[in-house]
Amino acid sequence: MNGTEGPFFYIPMVNTTGVVRSPYEYPQYYLVNPAAYACLGAYMFFLILVGFPVNFLTLYVTLEHKKLRTPLNYILLNLAVADLFMVFGGFTTTIYTSMHGYFVLGRLGCNIEGFFATLGGEIALWSLVVLAIERWVVVCKPISNFRFGENHAIMGVAFTWFMASACAVPPLVGWSRYIPEGMQCSCGIDYYTRAEGFNNESFVIYMFTVHFCIPLAVVGFCYGRLLCAVKEAAAAQQESETTQRAEREVSRMVVIMVIGFLVCWLPYASVAWYIFTHQGSEFGPLFMTIPAFFAKSSSIYNPMIYICMNKQFRHCMITTLCCGKNPFEEEEGASTTKTEASSVSSSSVSPA
């Protein structure tokens, strides 16, 4: 084994020289240069500095503007709440621990940080899945005479919390566990060991299948069908410049949304699966830290893609920030043209 396993931790370094110490008790500067911990703390501070205002503004603007409080926007508020969970439950903790060079909050703190970071990330993940399903149902109309209402939106939000809890709670009660990972300043699910009594193997397989492969397949299917519907509408109305413009805009949005999903989750899931299937192989502390950066940064680019790209949200945000006036109102209004002749429009399938 090219690492050192201890009670509730795994250090990616063989203890041949006797320098390896518990990440709950001693600085881990023997793993990487102390400057790396400063960079980690600075990155977390940047995520908080940008992620908190954007997501908080989303909630505030929705409360202030009644026209935003529609069932189709409930899942976006849920996404903002999930990102705030990651900001307060994960990023603030990592700043504090990176300043010390180890997980100074102990075993209980590791469980709390790991739980909130996982819960927030999973709520965000399943919010994107529900969002894709909602757009597919509204635009492609696979169910005739179906009208999306408030009860459906609430069920969608409840579903995201149920699925997120189904991933974040088990490690607290004995099915897998939370341990320090990467540079040992943040905690995550144990992909690294086959510790007796925790059934890590079955949990990782369950998580990879249910909480990555299935969401990826659903998002791909829904946006693929949506894109086909938009292109069919555009082909049927080739003489309409409005329809052609809507088709191009929607296609661009779909591509951005799928790429954003993959950038967020593919690196982390791939590395976690590699570590799990190659336990005992040699890898450095940055091997898991860097992919985690992509997943954590979703608290910034998720609202940018799914909220700020939505014309209605963007207009209300600018109005709120500019004390009730939108200096770009003419430009915003001109770009909200909808296709009357078809059931597909850029506003109905936009990220919000």
Swiss-Prot record:
Chain spans, region Disordered: 331-352
Transmembrane segments: 37-61, 74-96, 111-133, 153-173, 203-224, 253-274, 287-308
Cellular location(s): Membrane; Cell projection, Cilium, Photoreceptor outer segment
Membrane topology: Multi-pass membrane protein
Keyword Metal-binding assigned: no
GO cellular component annotations of the record: membrane; photoreceptor disc membrane; plasma membrane
Residue ranges of the motif 'Ionic lock' involved in activated form stabilization: 134-136
Cytoplasmic side: 62-73, 134-152, 225-252, 309-352
UniProt keywords, alphabetically: Cell projection, Chromophore, Disulfide bond, G-protein coupled receptor, Glycoprotein, Lipoprotein, Membrane, Palmitate, Phosphoprotein, Photoreceptor protein, Receptor, Retinal protein, Sensory transduction, Transducer, Transmembrane, Transmembrane helix, Vision
Disulfide bond sites: 110-187
InterPro entries named in the record: GPCR_opsins (IPR050125), GPCR_Rhodpsn (IPR000276), GPCR_Rhodpsn_7TM (IPR017452), Opsin (IPR001760), Retinal_BS (IPR027430), Rhodopsin (IPR000732), Rhodopsin_N (IPR019477)
Gene3D superfamilies found in the cross-reference section: Rhodopsin 7-helix transmembrane proteins (1.20.1070.10)
Similarity annotation: Belongs to the G-protein coupled receptor 1 family. Opsin subfamily.
Function: Photoreceptor required for image-forming vision at low light intensity. While most salt water fish species use retinal as chromophore, most freshwater fish use 3-dehydroretinal, or a mixture of retinal and 3-dehydroretinal. Light-induced isomerization of 11-cis to all-trans retinal triggers a conformational change that activates signaling via G-proteins. Subsequent receptor phosphorylation mediates displacement of the bound G-protein alpha subunit by arrestin and terminates signaling.
Protein name: Rhodopsin
Protein species of origin: Gobius niger (Black goby)
